[in-house]
Amino acid sequence: MMEKPEGLKLIDENGRRIDGRKKYELRPIKMEVGVLKNANGSAYIEWGKNKIIAAVYGPRELHPKHLQRPDRAILRVRYNMAPFSVEERKKPGPDRRSIEISKVIKGALEPALILEMFPRTAIDVFIEVLQADAGTRVAGITAASLALADAGIPMRDLVAACAAGKIEGEIVLDLNKEEDNYGEADVPVAIMPLKNDITLLQMDGYLTKDEFIEAVKLAIKGAKAVYQKQREALKEKYLKIAQEVEGSE
């Protein structure tokens, strides 16, 4: 969180935010599944100005063998921001933030995967941020979950994610870049809606106990809306495949 420039209003007296949204409104979200031919599974997501692609490879035999688990597959996640994803060119390669977010995303996805079905193997998830505009970790989790489903990895449920936060003393849904930079708090949440499980819960900033509870409830509500969009994106892909099969008969 940065110090807010003098005169900048993140929310006006009518409850409208800097990008015109209401307090509890998501940014526009577009999802597409199966965008990469050479990956076992893939997904592309546009979330506000974020543009993120996720690819899944595996399960495949893990080398070197001493890293193998005899009872389950190992999930490996790499989150990376392209050098051109932000206004000031980012130095290529992993940095501390990317390594930390990779671990966070792995922790959010792992409870959904039935890894016991693939002992001695690895499942690799690559998340590439092409354009960043706040909320890349929740968008990355959402895209990666879709890519895992597209790869046919057995899952207990999809993982959907969303963040809530606090700006100008108000709890709002889905912070954009200015709100993330100059707001007071950010609460990213990931859930498995069918199981009613939370797989990620973080907080950056300061909230009272009541504000925290309100933010978590709002983020869960947002994640459930994201979950419906995930389901629609998967249905769209498999309807297209069904139509192609029918057309070739």
Swiss-Prot record:
Disulfide pairings: none
Compartments where found: Cytoplasm
GO BP term, pick one: gene expression
Annotated Pfam families: RNase_PH, RNase_PH_C
GO molecular function annotations of the record: 3'-5'-RNA exonuclease activity; RNA binding
Predominant location: cytoplasm
EC number: 3.1.13.-
Top EC class for this record: hydrolase
InterPro entries with a match to the protein in the record: ExoRNase_PH_dom1, ExoRNase_PH_dom2, ExoRNase_PH_dom2_sf, PNPase/RNase_PH_dom_sf, Ribosomal_Su5_D2-typ_SF, RNase_PH, Rrp41
GO cellular component, one term: cytoplasmic exosome (RNase complex)
Transmembrane segments: none
Keyword entries, A-Z: Cytoplasm, Exonuclease, Exosome, Hydrolase, Nuclease
Family listed: Belongs to the RNase PH family. Rrp41 subfamily.
Subunit structure: Component of the archaeal exosome complex. Forms a hexameric ring-like arrangement composed of 3 Rrp41-Rrp42 heterodimers. The hexameric ring associates with a trimer of Rrp4 and/or Csl4 subunits.
NCBIfam families the UniProt entry points to: ECX1
Function in brief: Catalytic component of the exosome, which is a complex involved in RNA degradation. Has 3'->5' exoribonuclease activity. Can also synthesize heteromeric RNA-tails.
Name this polypeptide is given: Exosome complex component Rrp41
Native organism: Pyrococcus abyssi (strain GE5 / Orsay)
Gene behind this protein: rrp41
